[in-house]
Amino acid sequence: MVLRLSFLVLWMLVFAGLAAQTLGGSSAFNFLRLQLHPQAGALGGRNVSHFKADLGMVSENPSLLRESHHAVVSANFTSLAPSITGLYAAGAYHLEKKATTVALGITHLGYGEQSETDASGNTLGTFKAYDQSLGVTVSRIYNKKWYYGSTLKLINSRYGAFASQGLALDVGLNYYDEKRMIQFGFAAKNMGVQIKSYGNGKEDLPFDLVLGMTKQLEKAPIRFSLTGQRMHQFDLLYNDTLFNETNFGRQPRANLGTKIFSHFVLGADILVGEKIVLTGGYNVLRRRELRIQNFASGLTGFSYGFNLNLQRLRCYYARTHYQSALSHHQISFSFTLEAAGD
């Protein structure tokens, strides 16, 4: 009965999110789209099904929070640009009597000190800008193979004199078959409201519907992941009609194949012994959106990294290429406060 009720609430929330779709970039709190954990970053930037997920991956899918994350703390750092940094920290605890795992996560994006000017370009001074969110995640297991969870996020954003607050909810579901070493994942992200707007009118949140699968080969130390992002929207082409009136920089209309494959994110892990994992990923949409016409695209859309697994410490690193001359680095440390048997 509880599971059926959970599914009913889940789909009601999903369809509520489907009713609030906006042009990419025109919604509020778009920093919620960013992935600030290097494990997901190295896998292409989206993954909701990885069954060896670190605690930081809970920001991708709340149902990835497991009992194994008990007493784990994680700190993540992302360098997006010379003056833009992203920080994400999380901690988890398993409530044995309630068979429930809970986690607290904090996100902070700082955009540095910016110049404040008037309409004529005269410098008036400087201001600071940042985005923040505080999330509480709850996850449980059902019938040994099903995991379900949700994250409630409080959002705070300030750009100088302009401030905004919001409330968002993520819900997730996983099916894990340990014998076949395969996991399927589902997440509906950023469903909520803007409580206080920057100006007079309120904006929608950047809703996303993500599906994924991760499979480990039986006779080779390799895991593959296939993830579909923004599955509620068929055509992901950024088509700003107001901007296109100038016909400057307008890309050709996407064909059917491009529309389909733009949803996909591919990822792979190579297990080097028991302590080292090499990771690579490819984000089709990122390569399409950020390529520069008539110029070589290079590694745009590709990402890679590694993680080092020690007894109580895990270290993750990722590098993501946005354009030939632009990439960002991510690093994360996860520490288990209690050893097994403590």
Each language-model region and where it sits:
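Positively charged n-region of N-terminal signal peptides that target proteins for export
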Residues: 1-5, 144
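Short linear sequence motifs
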Residues: 4, 8, 22-24
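Bacterial N-terminal signal peptides
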Residues: 6-17
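Subset of outer-membrane beta-barrel
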Residues: 21-342
